[in-house]
Amino acid sequence: TLPYTGRAKEILKLYLTDFTEDELNYCVEGAYKKSSFSSEKIAPLYKISDKESILELWRGPTCAFKDMALQLLPYLLSVSASKTLKDTKIVILVATSGDTGKAALEGFKDVDNTQILVFYPVDGVSPMQKLQMTTQEGNNVSVCAIKGNFDDAQSGVKSIFTNSEIKKKFAENHLAFSSANSINWGRLVPQIVYYVSAY
């Protein structure tokens, strides 16, 4: 039986057809390293009866299931950017109501050629989530509390993505936008891995 990383590579290569084997190895082994997950099985499956099992998706660095995707996304994005956006820094904009923010900050911290900015509603996250985000280490991480709710944060991020003047100014300065929210395919494809792996 293949370990989780082996299953991840086999599944991801079906979707990421423009990634080489070495690139997939780099992404998967970097994302799911033992120092980031509390179980070497990454997403252990425990049988509790003949018909029921429990899949643990909380073994990552922030104890949120979103770590499963947000540990891999920075690697996928970096490899993709090296092919298509040479000499460009990727600015990751994220709207969160809690878990996504911390998991994205943790995933992207200190990743070369990236900057991440997380927007969260000032009264819309728990005190623990706020503390996790506002104390995040990393030389490329920032958080911004907004007045309003999650929908307001998300609308603000979308308006930045669609503002042609902002995009033009960023492009002139060798900057490009991306997202760590679930609109990004790189957030979704890692989820396929743990569903298939559990099966």
What is each model feature region?
Residues 1-199:
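PLP-dependent amino-acid enzyme catalytic core
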